[in-house]
Amino acid sequence: MVPVVALVGRPNVGKSTLFNRLTRTRDALVADFPGLTRDRKYGRAEIEGREFICIDTGGIDGTEDGVETRMAEQSLLAIEEADVVLFMVDARAGLMPADEAIAKHLRSREKPTFLVANKTDGLDPDQAVVDFYSLGLGEIYPIAASHGRGVLSLLEHVLLPWMEDLAPQEEVDEDAEYWAQFEAEENGEEEEEDDFDPQSLPIKLAIVGRPNVGKSTLTNRILGEERVVVYDMPGTTRDSIYIPMERDGREYVLIDTAGVRKRGKITDAVEKFSVIKTLQAIEDANVVMLVIDAREGISDQDLSLLGFILNSGRSLVIVVNKWDGLSQEVKEQVKETLDFRLGFIDFARVHFISALHGSGVGNLFESVREAYDSSTRRVGTSMLTRIMTMAVEDHQPPLVRGRRVKLKYAHAGGYNPPIVVIHGNQVKDLPDSYKRYLMNYFRKSLDVMGSPIRIQFKEGENPYANKRNTLTPTQMRKRKRLMKHIKKSK
């Protein structure tokens, strides 16, 4: 399971600035759910190849409503589901009553918490953080998030050791074992007999969507048809239920983000729909089924979830639920809206179903298998290079500074999603339009459906770049003779 880091603190202490630093973007809004999880932003970050989900929570000001109430509205869920908390304070403003109230709550949760003092630029860090030791949270890490000072030290001394300690607790994933073995073979390491292939693994399928779009109904419909006993897989956390099932001789693991609960125990929408569980299910899945309500259309929440799915590179099947009972005119309007708002998703199958009555549900698994097979299929270097050559013959790369961009060869760079690595000269200068052309050409040639495809470009380093051209003695003598000839001719 992908670990979660939550940033908490009073308003304007620099949580969003640090969030953008960790996610390495100025606009790291991956999923924003207004009204449900107010003012919280979710992003994917990485430390030395280790991925984690970062949450920028809303500011907690400790007003008359009470810190507990305020946290329950916007930050309590994030703290409860986080693996570690970075508690941020403002070194310039000093210790505030709200800081003490937040620290008291964090101590009661017994959650790994690290105190980060921001805005220490221009101050003596040792003097600026003295008052915050009274919070009883141990060592204080001074940073200046706006300038990046101290952030690297925070990563190296806090987050990285914590993630290394967390790693041994995770179970070995057969998927990871398989792809590690495959990469070793690709790198020319000694190849052992391969009894392990993607078809031998169960397909991990996550059903995600907004509240009340019919995820639970669809899950129950699928399980009801298969008559599978539901149980918690050992090692799973945060109430995500992993449900083994079989259909048409193929094994699946259905990831139920809502959890198996009686309807009477679900007290509010926040409990029913956990953003964190949804994002982690997407990261852990092979194929994601995005459920959309046909009666409400495509909302910003749907697009936010879709953005996270695309960013994670997972295979995708789009399911439009509650299709029954709609007039033909309304159905045509829904399809037009889908084409308009989801026109850029040209690789995913779209199914129109009724989870309540079961119509169209049986056809979903054909698309799931197709998407999984497309994302895990092995393709050799010779085949990829041949496709690249055909693409170049059909449409030449553009000229860059008077020279034609040259593409040399292509090979596989990874799977799930498929990655094609193209080597050549001046490839960094290729326009986005030509990159999209190549991506679509590879998709069509390889018949990739249901899975995104990514193309990476690499070019060899010029050994003479940034080096002064030094003439040899022979070249110097030739140059002198040439200069004498030019002077005589004048």
From Swiss-Prot:
Amino acids binding GTP 2: 209-216, 256-260, 321-324
At the top level, the lineage of the source is: Bacteria
Q: One MF term from GO for this chain?
A: GTP binding
Fetch the SUPFAM superfamilies from UniProt.
P-loop containing nucleoside triphosphate hydrolases
> InterPro entries per the record?
G_ENGA (IPR031166), GTP-bd (IPR006073), GTPase_Der (IPR016484), KH_dom-like (IPR032859), KH_dom-like_a/b (IPR015946), P-loop_NTPase (IPR027417), Small_GTP-bd (IPR005225)
Q: Which residues bind GTP 1?
A: 9-16, 56-60, 118-121
Q: Which UniProt keywords apply?
A: GTP-binding, Nucleotide-binding, Repeat, Ribosome biogenesis
Q: Which GO terms describe its biological process?
A: ribosome biogenesis
Which Gene3D superfamilies is this protein grouped with? Answer: 3.30.300.20, P-loop containing nucleotide triphosphate hydrolases
KH-like domain location: 377-461
EngA-type G domain residues: 3-166, 203-376
Q: Name one Pfam family in it.
A: KH_dom-like
CDD domains per the UniProt record, alphabetical = EngA1, EngA2
PROSITE patterns (UniProt xref): G_ENGA
Q: Function of this protein?
A: GTPase that plays an essential role in the late steps of ribosome biogenesis.
Oligomer status and interactors: Associates with the 50S ribosomal subunit.
Family that this chain belongs to:
Belongs to the TRAFAC class TrmE-Era-EngA-EngB-Septin-like GTPase superfamily. EngA (Der) GTPase family.
NCBIfam families, per the entry: GTPase_EngA, small_GTP
Q: What is this protein called?
A: GTPase Der
